[in-house]
């Protein structure tokens, strides 16, 4: 029997399961130049964005991760998305990812919502380690992870190709303290 999808809350945000009506907001985010500049995926149509919605659902179904729609607690407005993927039960680790619509940047929503995600990973899933892979040039994301007490472990130089050029990724990690 499947567990009920967890709803996570803080003072200003609610993290909930994606619903079909989120499609337009996910498309808005994953087609926005300021988001996709550092994000690994982008879409050019609502129809193509359905692939991402399926990915969100498949993560949970296949127990390889869980992503939430990040929403305003006040009015339910969609702010962005965040979650865990690439879960390894054997190694008790996962990868954190997140993005916010640009109009929500600089308002503390990410700093408020991401502890809900990693605490869920540590306390409910039983993870020992949560990793974040960040393009070396993405200063805003690196600052956000540092504020959340993720430690920079190193840089994988020229490890991926994006737009026909090699990019480097910084590896950040947070390890559960027991």
Describe the function of each predicted region:
Residues 11, 48, 60-61, 92:
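Intrinsically disordered, low-complexity regions enriched in Ser/Pro/Gly/Gln/His and often acidic
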């Amino acid at each position: 029997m499947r567990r009920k999808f967890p709803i996570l809350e803080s003072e200003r945000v609610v993290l909930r399961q994606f619903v079909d009506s989120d499609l337009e907001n996910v498309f808005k985010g994953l087609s926005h130049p300021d988001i996709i500049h550092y994000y690994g995926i982008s879409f050019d149509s609502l129809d193509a964005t359905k692939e991402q919605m399926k990915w969100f659902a498949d993560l949970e179904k296949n127990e390889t991760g869980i992503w939430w729609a990040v929403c305003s607690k006040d009015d339910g407005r969609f702010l962005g998305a965040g979650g865990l993927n690439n879960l390894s039960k054997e190694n008790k680790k996962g990868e954190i990812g997140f993005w916010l619509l640009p109009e929500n940047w600089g308002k503390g929503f990410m700093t408020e919502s991401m502890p809900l995600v990693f605490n869920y990973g540590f306390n409910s899933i039983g993870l020992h380690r949560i990793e974040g892979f960040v393009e070396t040039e993405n200063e805003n994301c690196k600052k956000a992870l540092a504020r959340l007490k993720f430690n920079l472990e190193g840089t994988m130089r020229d490890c991926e190709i994006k737009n026909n050029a090699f990019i480097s990724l910084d590896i950040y990690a947070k390890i559960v303290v027991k």
